[in-house]
Amino acid sequence: MNRVYNDHHIPVLLNEVVENLIWKPDGVYVDCTVGEGGHTRAIAERVLPYGGRVIGIDVDSEVLQIAEHNLLSYPNVQLFKFSYVELPVLLSLLQVHKVDGLLVDLGVSTYQLKAEGRGFSFNQDEPLDMRMNLENNLTAYHIVNTYPEEKLADIIYNYGEENFSRRIARAIVQNRPIQTTRQLVEVIKRALPYKEVHNRKRHFATKTFQAIRIEVNKEIENISKFLEFAPDYLNSGGRLAIISFHSLEDRIVKHVFKNDKRLKPIGDFISPTTFEVAENPRARSAKLRLAERV
């Protein structure tokens, strides 16, 4: 697959992440979801003069190649193909016991949305895939074409917060096999009432696609697992920063930050400015939450 080395993607809440995550300029920081390297580069730039270093990980081998290209000029960055739920394994291999900051951006990267054949976007006609880790077996095609109707409906309702989940699940089952993203969009369109198709602020397929993507990549399970162990890998005073894009993730993060005795929340969540949303519309639903290791 051809990869476009895009040096102009826009990281979400970039300044807010850098200003709040970096408290020790000579420290060790981990970007747990490197993507195309925007946050990683900004962190590396800030800590480089002080001898600070950045460990970057991502589960997507294709997007990691783009990050490698974009970060060539930063000698204080090391990149690895790992999932953030595998962080303890990587830190053990690197003989790093604790770090000073952890960042997780739970959004989909620009590359993943636009790259041919990945199946993340409803704006293109592609095979139903949606895997962030291309080595995983579970795809959107498998979910759409094999899951029982009730299970599909629950996923669309719980992960997509879609009120018409039962109607959509029934339509999916009735129209199997569904091969491509465009076919799935048409099925969703026919399942929804007219006003839901034409009057929603976002595209009518957004919630269903989000739900399927979350199921494919086990996103809720992964962030829950990560939050269980992450505080143990932070030095005292270390920062944990999580960017979420929908209320289900944010509720989990908020609950842990409030109730985990190892952590102290830093203020309330941070939202993008009106200017940032105008420049980068996909930032509109982002929330940054921060906590400090006690």
UniProtKB/Swiss-Prot annotation:
Residues bound to S-adenosyl-L-methionine: 37-39, 58, 93, 105, 112
Taxonomic superkingdom: Bacteria
Function noted in UniProt: Specifically methylates the N4 position of cytidine in position 1402 (C1402) of 16S rRNA.
EC number assigned by the record: 2.1.1.199
GO molecular function terms listed in the Swiss-Prot or TrEMBL record: rRNA (cytosine-N4-)-methyltransferase activity
Main localization of the protein described in the UniProt heading: cytoplasm
Organism taxonomic ancestry: Bacteria, Thermotogati, Thermotogota, Thermotogae, Thermotogales
Name of the featured protein: Ribosomal RNA small subunit methyltransferase H
Cited HAMAP family: 16SrRNA_methyltr_H
Species for this entry: Fervidobacterium nodosum (strain ATCC 35602 / DSM 5306 / Rt17-B1)
Catalytic activity from the UniProt record: cytidine(1402) in 16S rRNA + S-adenosyl-L-methionine = N(4)-methylcytidine(1402) in 16S rRNA + S-adenosyl-L-homocysteine + H(+)
Entry's family note: Belongs to the methyltransferase superfamily. RsmH family.
Cellular-component GO terms for this entry: cytoplasm
GO biological process: rRNA base methylation
A Pfam family matched in the record: Methyltransf_5
Top-tier EC class: transferase
Location of this chain's protein in the cell: Cytoplasm
CDD domains per the UniProt record, alphabetical: AdoMet_MTases
Keyword entries, A-Z: Cytoplasm, Methyltransferase, rRNA processing, S-adenosyl-L-methionine, Transferase
UniProt-listed SUPFAM superfamilies: Putative methyltransferase TM0872, insert domain, S-adenosyl-L-methionine-dependent methyltransferases
